[in-house]
Amino acid sequence: MAQDLHLENIRREYSSRSLSRKELPDDPLEMVDQWLKEALETQVNEPTAMIVATATPDGRPSVRTVLLKEVVGGRFVFYSNYESRKGRQMAENPHVAVTFLWHELERQIHVEGTVTRLSPEESDAYFAMRPYKSRVGARISPQSQPIPSREYIMMRFASESLRFVGREVPRPDNWGGYAVTPSRIEFWQGRDSRLHDRFLYELQPDGHWDLHRLAP
């Protein structure tokens, strides 16, 4: 039996930065761009990692970490297997939430919005850029499904790798891109005494963003 864990005394103070209203542009995507660039420049661990939460139509949630590949046209783009758990949930319920967490900068961005698939042409273009082994892996993995062993998946990988030696590896039909169109974006900056700076942008019907400071 697992032992109880008592973690009440584990805490740290956040004090390296602040965030004020005057720093924030009218368009939150400009701030996303600024914070992403700072995360890349300061070489934080996995700066493009984003936590994606999905849910079934009856509200049963699941969450995982994927890698952001682009922010284009105001949308957050990532790629996955359409038949994975998240792929099935997004097909049934397009409402998703995304979090970027950069411990080193004591920052988070929270995004809520709806997700759509990219076109086959867009998915093909990105798939062709992936390393050879990643393309092969995408073809042979029944993502999120039970498998008998590690050896099973490695045998499939070896077989498919030999099949495409010296040839172009085509994108499988069950793999491609997703784009999250945001309707809410929150910027969170850690502060001391847990009095964090939080600002929420909410998209309005006329296309402009309302901005509010939130209580920590």
Residue map of PLM features:
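Binding-site signature for planar aromatic cofactors or substrates
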Residues: 1-216
